């Protein structure tokens, strides 16, 4: 049987039809029908079948590795911060924060014009997107083994700074979609596996696709752009080689069999080409921002979004540099505040080994006969500059805001730095050489220990979040029950357009409610939990009002009048003549709060008598 007969026969077997068409139109035209070519066709078909099995195994392994960290969080089914207010009122609200793609995605999952609680489906979809990116890394970065892809991809998504991102029952999907879009934009521009169809495409098509993905990332979640910046710098840092070494290696791999095995074509990876690639990516980022900023100005609404969306003035250069220095110091403090000693040491070790190897490689892969000293100096200085630029790239354009908010959820570039450094340092022909076998084992060992630490952090966060949510829910019910006994007007119909009650009852919280007993140890010992565990019942906290509304106080609103706030604090609420104590527990111990209606304001006081006495003696 000839190759042409086999191609026609296999055309009826579903997934083999593509291979059959290729063999009929390409292979049969290029080769003479001999037994050697028949064996080549069988090898291509077997390779396709093997790759499909390997891809399924990689996807299942990625789902399992990510699931170890995400399943405990998803099983809690706790509404986190914005989820509570969105569930109560049924509003979307992402468009007001200049995230139209996020709102569009969630409206596709909704029922009409109001948001319906479909949790945990958005979180499950985010889990699937995160796992699927391991396949993209495997296909776009030649030389990566499936195990390294699974491990590196897990380090990208499971970090102490993505706890909030996956905790949101709704926002987890747009955030994950934005991160995946930014990563895909970087990988599309990276030289990877190119087939005959891809080689015939025009050069501008990858850039146009990357620009669209960057715009999608900005419209889903603005900090996702930082992932693209970090991966671009890592690609330049770990992918550039001197022209002499590049030319010699190209001559060594000049046979068709070696090209087929490597799965890529030879392309220039010199320092100059790396600089040109960085300039190209910088131009794409600038173009995406120029397209996005006018859109954001049209969509942004609300005091909070407008306040934190203003840019620094570019007219005063000294003031601009001082503001950038201050913002960078605040960002680094937020970074240190989310890392415990073990995770910080492991992360630092991984980055030092991976980036250090990239910086040291320039002087060890060649000798002076192959590359001039000027090229060596240029390469070393370029690599050092790229490594230093990784620090501001973690926050990207956020540093240019007048009042940036460095929440932990915005530091999504940290995972891209860890996972990208691991995978790009182990990718390629050089990383598989025997001279770097020790480095490979060291990187994989540190990365595995770091992933184990991140699993523990996710487990601690999941349990602490569940305990705190249950504690605040019970506390809100007790407050509302006592308010009804006191005859406070806590219920009122709400307007469906403005989401405000017809008869408002302003709420002022004094003091701070204690944390849940089951969450106190985790809050003390795990910095990531302490950074993300937000107590609702604190002064001037909107989430306290949301908690009370969930317990049945539909008339509650947050008191925003500063003069009324100052008048309510004097005399102290802990004065027995001005408050009504809550009934005690069964054991006879008093409750932790008191409440009263003062000047038309619902005052809830968590201050103890000891704190009030201390406040009285202060000057």
Predicted regions and their residues:
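Transmembrane catalytic cores of multi-pass membrane glycosyltransferases
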Residues: 67-124, 130, 151-153, 169, ...
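Signature aromatic-anchored transmembrane alpha helix within multi-pass, membrane-resident enzymes
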Residues: 427-457
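Structural signal for the C-terminal ends of transmembrane alpha-helices
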Residues: 136-141, 186-194, 233-242, 356-369, ...
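Start-transfer (signal-anchor) and selected internal transmembrane alpha helices
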Residues: 14, 18, 22-68
